[in-house]
């Protein structure tokens, strides 16, 4: 599930699509659905999970609170001491990325799509009738639309159309352990565990565990441009950066302390300033569509593809995509702002995102002449298309807005 209702719908659709893909193409997607456990160590995290459970019930999704005894039956290797709330998602799981990619390709070819691998795009030129000429070393392609879904190379492809996208890659690492006897002895696949207060995630991989974290020490990569020759090689291992996260994971799953590390994966992922996808048609260009910066890619890819098709063919998607529309950022979202916000988003990936919360990173960007006057009057500022603007006025200057799922310090002044 996701804090956003529409993203939850997209993810739900995507997981169901993978089953349809397998049946239709005969290509396995490597679907594992042993369920997922979500843990809350604090009252506010409990509130967040309870809010998600209420949304799940409204939209017919299976996500509910369970007691400790039930959780221990589901995952006997987890120590649930100190956990306030445990949520259970029976359909939670993961897929095999290579299998899903192959299934998408097979399904597309069955419907007449042509796929050109290892073919660099050297130019995208808009024609007088609104169509596009795409130049490659292997020949030119004429297309009514261009869809930029270029992953790590989204910025470079966008620049071919004189478009700047506020995106920046970071390093991200996780590791897979050797076989853990206690897991092998279970005779079944164990649920994944999301302990966001502990700032790590883990799931079964073979008869071991896959453990990952979003550390506070963010490491940026390819800040100016992604090298054309980059072939998804891995970076040097640097597990010391996630040592604290791993120690918390060991406290929660003690068998992890005796496990050897089988392999470490340290690779890039590309982020937008608010970690949401840059999605939708580009206003300045006719028939040019972007779908870039999808951090949880394989849990959202199918839904994003559906909405992109709807938007292109029918003129609008079925869901409100305002929060993901790429036009939420303009030229004011420069490199400095993007780097500051991406660093903040990465480091706080597992922090609670409260309703109406405003992030301070990268601000201020644009100030109106009345800014200082408003501050002296007690204005609590928010960000709106790069501009600092008053959200509400306190009875004293420099008031810091509180965040939570109950009434906060803005309630009385606004009411």
Where are these regions (language model features)?
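Dinucleotide-binding Rossmann-like beta1-alpha1 core, especially the glycine-rich loop
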Residues: 1-74, 197-202, 206-210, 343-357, ...
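Short Gly/Ser/Thr- and Asp/Glu-enriched loop/turn motifs at secondary-structure junctions
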Residues: 32-36, 170-171, 264
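Flavin-dependent oxidoreductases
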Residues: 1, 5, 123-235, 244-252, ...
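C-terminal catalytic lobe of FAD-dependent flavoproteins
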Residues: 197, 206, 228-366
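Basic, glycine/lysine-rich polyanion-binding surfaces/domains
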Residues: 126-128, 322-415
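Helical element adjacent to the flavin cofactor pocket in flavoenzyme catalytic cores
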Residues: 87-145, 149, 153-156, 302
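A short, glycine/Asx- and small/polar-enriched loop/turn
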Residues: 44, 75-83, 125-133, 271-275, ...
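Helix-loop-beta segment of a Rossmann-like dinucleotide-binding subdomain
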Residues: 28-38, 52, 72-111, 133, ...
